[in-house]
Swiss-Prot record:
Annotated compartments: Nucleus
GO biological process annotation, one example: flower development
Name assigned to this protein: Floral homeotic protein APETALA 1 C
Tissue-specific expression: Expressed in some of the meristems of arrest-stage cauliflower heads.
A GO term from the CC aspect: nucleus
InterPro entries xrefs: MADS-box/MEF2_TF, MEF2-like_N, TF_Kbox, TF_MADSbox, TF_MADSbox_sf
Amino acid sequence: MGRGRVQLKRIENKINRQVTFSKRRAGLFKKAHEISVLCDAEVALVVFSHKGKLFEYSTDSCMEKILERYERYSYAERQLIAPESDVNTNWSMEYNRLKAKIELLERNQRHYLGEDLQAMSPKELQNLEQQLDTALKHIRSRKNQLMYDSVNELQRKEKAIQEQNSMLSKQIKEREKVLMAQQEQWDQQNHGQNMPSPPPPQQHQIQHPYMLSHQPSPFLNMGGLYQEEDPMAMRRNDLDLSLEPVYNCNLGCFAA
């Protein structure tokens, strides 16, 4: 005999109802996972127990993206079919949608901070762990990239400073060479000026013996400036002195 169909009705026994809920929920999540893998579909399941406990399942993409996609499509369809008189109703629905989204984001934020984890299933905890691992990978990758860029920038600055120092050192050496050459040239000029000049060549002149014996001699002029006597005047004086005895002798002869 074939197995009879099970009548669908509410289970009155609380324990049996809880056990059945756990089994059917696990089977539902399993079927959702199978259809997502086999058919490459994005699946999101949200289940609340009779006590108000939340159970959810989503594919590799997070629940928020799937819900945002659902809201976007459903809102666009409602905008197409809604008459203009239902503007207030649409605003109310938009408010409810945004409010639910805010609550979901706040709950996920608490989960990311390690809070309110008691109501999460092992599968949900595993998904949360994967999301945190992915976020940590992105954070570490970005941090390593920033550190690598910082090291490259410091190396570039160090190379520029070394090149600048080398250029300055080269300029200093060239300047020192120029100063040394100028100093040597200056020393040579000073040495040439301090050397005594050679005496002028002597000219051999034939002079009269009398003139050789009567060379002008310097004399001391007390209380005045020294003035050199004119050579022509000195010569005339010498001639007068030499002729005076002869002149006196002649005068004596005439007197006799």
